[in-house]
Regions:
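Structured alpha/beta reader/binder surfaces that contact nucleic acids or chromatin modification marks
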Residues: 1-139
Length: 139
């Protein structure tokens, strides 16, 4: 199974129910479609940057409101497999994505059907898409 490492809080936002983040932004496109495991990276750089933006009032109100269910960010899992999603499309950013508070491209990976593990599993992440040996059984 292919896996993608995503920094927190974005990894948890992708896996959240109800849905928070349906588009993952990447600098590159992929021909892959289908099941994709989501790994939460170990870095807290985005959490720290987001906290600074929140304190400065620089974050978009829609994005902040959407992230509220994930608080507190410091308790989000790091360095773990969170579950699987279905990668249904990969498109360059366009007007189609303007209403999504998190979509900014340059490539928008459209994700559906998040299926979160009951308990996150420690796993070493990598850059890009990578194969994992973890076997995920859908409930």
């Amino acid at each position: 199974m292919l896996c993608l490492t995503v920094c927190q809080p974005w990894a948890s936002a992708i896996m959240a129910k109800p849905r928070i983040k349906v588009v993952e932004n990447r600098d590159w496109s992929t021909p892959h479609r289908g099941v994709l495991a989501i790994h939460a990276g170990k870095s807290t750089k985005w959490i720290k940057a987001l906290r600074a933006e929140m304190a400065a009032g620089a974050c978009g109100e829609r994005a902040l409101a959407a992230l509220e269910p994930l608080e507190p960010f410091e308790e989000l899992p790091l360095g773990m497999l969170l579950g699987v999603v279905e990668l249904v499309d990969c498109k360059p950013y366009s007007a189609e994505f303007e209403d999504d508070p998190f979509a900014c491209g340059p490539f928008c990976w459209v994700l559906e059907n998040p299926n979160r593990l009951a308990t996150p599993v420690p796993y070493r992440g990598q850059q890009g898409l990578f194969e994992i040996t973890f076997k995920y059984n859908s409930p």
